[in-house]
Amino acid sequence: MANSASPEQNQNHCSAINSSILLTQGNLPTLTLSGKIRVTVTFFLFLLSTAFNASFLLKLQKWTQRKEKGKKLSRMKVLLKHLTLANLLETLIVMPLDGMWNITVQWYAGEFLCKVLSYLKLFSMYAPAFMMVVISLDRSLAITRPLAVKSNSRLGRFMIGLAWLLSSIFAGPQLYIFRMIHLADSSGQTEGFSQCVTHGSFPQWWHQAFYNFFTFSCLFIIPLLIMLICNAKIMFTLTRVLQQDPHNLQLNQSKNNIPRARLRTLKMTVAFAASFIVCWTPYYVLGIWYWFDPEMVNRVSDPVNHFFFLFAFLNPCFDPLIYGYFSL
């Protein structure tokens, strides 16, 4: 997960090892073959996601230039711009950090970067999830309350700003709970093996459990529920319109009808939600399993563990493909 609760960190980042525990040289983590494959795939996805998201930002920039010539940038394109920025931020922070950390196994960057990068990692994970919530809410309101959305142009900007603000606030505890530890051998002598972990930051075990559940809820459960509710409301509204008059699905801008462009953005919103579920569910299922059964690390093979966690890196790669497919 985003902190020391994950089995991925337990295996590869030694985050489940407290600095007071004595280790032998043979117990220290190493870079395995499956770890090397994971690193290779991670950096490949990093290049892919960077290229896709940067290309879409350039395309949006061209639309922005057209806006200066009198063509207004649509509300949906503004939302897509911020989602792309959030995806690019996640790509540039999380993927290189994960790849390099798996290569080095231990932490060499010092305590300051341990705290700062842990904060930036969680911030860059919150931002895309919250932007997905904003898009789902905006599209739901555009269908269920079109006149209210059209008359309130500030609502979209407010939700976007709130998403960025909450991302920065909710990631704040990372600056406090992460720290460097130095592990010792069986004789008590320091071996020079250091790690960036959260151990010793929580007075009681349930404090860490609460923090883990909070981050899990904000990163996955709450966004997922909001997206499902919004998409259900959209489908219900569309079904009701079609039941009243099957010919209502016309290509005009009447408040009672659904223009084709809006239908296209609705399909894209559903595709975003599906991508979010497919990519993040394996990642969090593995994390939750570890919370309730830490010994699962010894039962789940290393390749399976790495494979499940790589799913999360597919999400920022898929989103630009979804943009392109629906040709906004």
Curated annotation (Swiss-Prot):
According to the record, which residues are glycosylated? N18, N102
Please list the GO terms describing molecular function: gonadotropin-releasing hormone receptor activity
UniProt note on tissues of expression? Pituitary gland.
Identify its membrane topology class. Answer: Multi-pass membrane protein
List the disulfide bonds in this chain: C114-C196
Q: List the ranges whose topology is Extracellular.
A: 1-38, 98-115, 185-212, 301-306
Kindly give the InterPro entries that the UniProt entry links to this protein.
Answer: GPCR_Rhodpsn (IPR000276), GPCR_Rhodpsn_7TM (IPR017452), GphnRH_fam_rcpt (IPR001658)
**Which is one Gene Ontology cellular component term of this protein?**
plasma membrane
Report the Gene3D superfamilies cross-referenced here: Rhodopsin 7-helix transmembrane proteins
Name the major location. membrane
Parts of the chain that traverse the membrane: 39-58, 78-97, 116-137, 165-184, 213-232, 282-300, 307-326
Annotated keywords: Cell membrane, Disulfide bond, G-protein coupled receptor, Glycoprotein, Membrane, Receptor, Transducer, Transmembrane, Transmembrane helix
A single BP term in Gene Ontology:
cellular response to hormone stimulus
Q: Which residues lie on this side of the membrane: Cytoplasmic?
A: 59-77, 138-164, 233-281, 327-328
Subcellular location as annotated: Cell membrane
Into which family does the record put it?
Belongs to the G-protein coupled receptor 1 family.
What's this protein's function?
Answer: Receptor for gonadotropin releasing hormone (GnRH) that mediates the action of GnRH to stimulate the secretion of the gonadotropic hormones luteinizing hormone (LH) and follicle-stimulating hormone (FSH). This receptor mediates its action by association with G-proteins that activate a phosphatidylinositol-calcium second messenger system.
What's the protein called, per UniProt?
Gonadotropin-releasing hormone receptor
Recorded source organism is Sus scrofa (Pig)
